[in-house]
Amino acid sequence: MNTAIVLAGGSGKRMHSEIPKQYMQLNGKPVIYYSLKAFEESEHVDEIILVTAKEYIEYVRNEIAGSQFAKLTKIIEGGKERFDSVWAGLQQISEKGYVYIHDGARPCINQNIINACWETVVQTDACVAAAPVKDTIKVADADEYAINTPDRKTLWQIQTPQVFSADVIKEAYSRLYEQNCFDGVTDDAMVVERYGNSKIKLVNCGYCNIKITTPEDMEIAGIFLKG
């Protein structure tokens, strides 16, 4: 069975909102709606697990879930950090099949992205949606002085979904929690890099799959979704 774990535990602090960004309105729908819809319509996904804050579980059940999302089989409580929420989701699935892990604040995911990741993961066991960096990147010291300029040709900006064979990602996360070393863990690919044996293939998914973090992102995502 192939599962999509959709993370909806973020806050709205940088959006200057008391409502988590995943539940803010975007083109007349909650932001999270678009991710759920994309996975619901995918032939490569059998079930969806939504991980959210405890206080929003009933809201999701009453206002978002329903017949339109038949694949949404579980709505569960997340953890304090992103990796805690992913781990909570992973404990709900079997060792077989593939797992899409996706940030619910990326509403512009589409079938092309899902399909491209699928075609890659069945060959590699581990891949992430990404895009080559367009801007020059500087490494700074503690005083915000530039100290180094990495070769831009080697840099990619990482997105979601991050897709893995279920046994690969569950084993990596199990070892993460066994080692109890969470410093610097920002995404799932990093967990596999540290504790797995699979190389991570980057899948060029372009620049429209943005993560909503600021009010400006909401405006841009709205334009992308209108197509």
Swiss-Prot record:
Source organism superkingdom: Bacteria
Pfam families: IspD
Site (Transition state stabilizer): R14, K21
Gene3D superfamilies documented for this protein: Spore Coat Polysaccharide Biosynthesis Protein SpsA, Chain A (3.90.550.10)
One Gene Ontology term from the biological process aspect of the record: isopentenyl diphosphate biosynthetic process, methylerythritol 4-phosphate pathway
Pathway the protein takes part in: Isoprenoid biosynthesis; isopentenyl diphosphate biosynthesis via DXP pathway; isopentenyl diphosphate from 1-deoxy-D-xylulose 5-phosphate: step 2/6
Keyword presence, S-adenosyl-L-methionine: no
Signal peptide as annotated in the record: none
CDD domains for the chain: CDP-ME_synthetase (cd02516)
GO terms of molecular function: 2-C-methyl-D-erythritol 4-phosphate cytidylyltransferase activity
EC number: 2.7.7.60
Reactions catalysed: 2-C-methyl-D-erythritol 4-phosphate + CTP + H(+) = 4-CDP-2-C-methyl-D-erythritol + diphosphate
Site (Positions MEP for the nucleophilic attack): R152, K211
Keywords: Isoprene biosynthesis, Nucleotidyltransferase, Transferase
Function: Catalyzes the formation of 4-diphosphocytidyl-2-C-methyl-D-erythritol from CTP and 2-C-methyl-D-erythritol 4-phosphate (MEP).
Family recorded in the similarity comment: Belongs to the IspD/TarI cytidylyltransferase family. IspD subfamily.
Protein name according to UniProt: 2-C-methyl-D-erythritol 4-phosphate cytidylyltransferase
Gene that this sequence comes from: ispD
